[in-house]
Amino acid sequence: MKKIPSFLQMYSALIASPTMSSIDPHFDQSNRTLIELLANWLSSLGFRTEVIPLEGSRDKFNLLATYGEGEGGLLLAGHTDTVPFDEGRWQFDPFKLTEKDGKFYGLGTADMKGFFAFVIDAVSQLDLTRLTKPLRILATADEETTMLGARTFIQHSHIRPDCAIIGEPTSLKPIRAHKGHVGEALRITGKSGHSSDPSKGINAIELMHEATGYLMQMRDELRQKYHHAAFNIPYPTMNFGAISGGDAVNRICACCELHFDIRPLPNLRLTDLNEMLQAKLAPMFEKWGGRISLQALHDPIPGYECAHSAQVVQVVEKLLGEQCETVNYCTEAPFIQQLCPTLVLGPGSIEQAHQPDEFLSAEFIDPTRELLSKLIGQFCTG
């Protein structure tokens, strides 16, 4: 068995490999180099590695590494990409792991490339020949944009682990449920003309005013109809995030576009939500036809919930001595959950994610190593 780098050497190498994902091709980057790093390290530890190209991506890949045979066992999962960074707001080099005052700075230190350094370091300290069930490690692409990596993996994967842990930054607090995310663009095409005679045009802003009234009715109905007591905000939310329209004060507005999102609870199916949205805007479609269009800004992400009775929930709560929680942000959990019961649990704080001078506190290092070793022992040694 070959010797692998130290924890900090691996951590540094991961941060030094840029893997930003973005809808904008100018900022979007391949994760090939990082995937190859992980594959080489895990191969050195005796894992079988499979690098999986993602069709329809810009040179993106998943990695599945397996030690052992058969079904069951544990899947440790995470994404390899980061969001882009605002160069003017960073004091530290985003691609150089920098330790200062008990904090490790760098893009992806917390969210979440650093998790793979923790996993490989923990695995390297174990006697893997004692495993009686397989240990799998999954590294995905494009979580920060389309979740293409996780979506593709579940479509083609035949593995059935006993459970999965996604190492997103949760401050080592277990998460067993979160809301989903639906982003929509409502576009209204009017008819321009001189503002001195509004009757000769169709004002898209006025139509949008009418449409937002229907959407606000739907927002109130969602709040009344759906409830989940485990969430701090126990109902689905709707937010009008961006609007644009018109080009001159003396012209009838010919075009107006609204971007809004809905965060459904786990008990609200995406098909039901879409039907509700179409029905609520039906009067607009019937009256104005092709002047009204509704298009998804991204593939919808469903809500996610792992039953409290699941073995992984019971084991993790006992190991950590605390109850699982819920959050309002999204992860790949709704997709991995289709394979097996899944928890979100990892080092670092979500408060540092997507922030300038992202960091992971050194206080997470030893507890994370210990927790990963216990989880592998619990689920892979029978």
UniProtKB/Swiss-Prot annotation:
Q: Which Pfam families match?
A: M20_dimer, Peptidase_M20
Entry EC no(s): 3.5.1.16
The answer, when asked if S-adenosyl-L-methionine is one of the entry's keywords, is no
CC cofactor:
Zn(2+); Co(2+); glutathione
| Record: active site | D81, E143
Co-factor binding comment: Binds 2 Zn(2+) or Co(2+) ions per subunit.
Major localization class:
cytoplasm
Q: Which GO terms describe its cellular component?
A: cytoplasm
**CDD domains assigned:** M20_ArgE
Q: In which pathway does it act?
A: Amino-acid biosynthesis; L-arginine biosynthesis; L-ornithine from N(2)-acetyl-L-ornithine (linear): step 1/1
Reading the lineage from the top rank, the first entry is: Bacteria
**Catalyses which reaction?**
N(2)-acetyl-L-ornithine + H2O = L-ornithine + acetate
Q: Where does Zn(2+) 2 bind?
A: D111, E144, H354
**What is the recorded name of this protein?**
Acetylornithine deacetylase
Q: What is the lineage of its organism?
A: Bacteria, Pseudomonadati, Pseudomonadota, Gammaproteobacteria, Pasteurellales
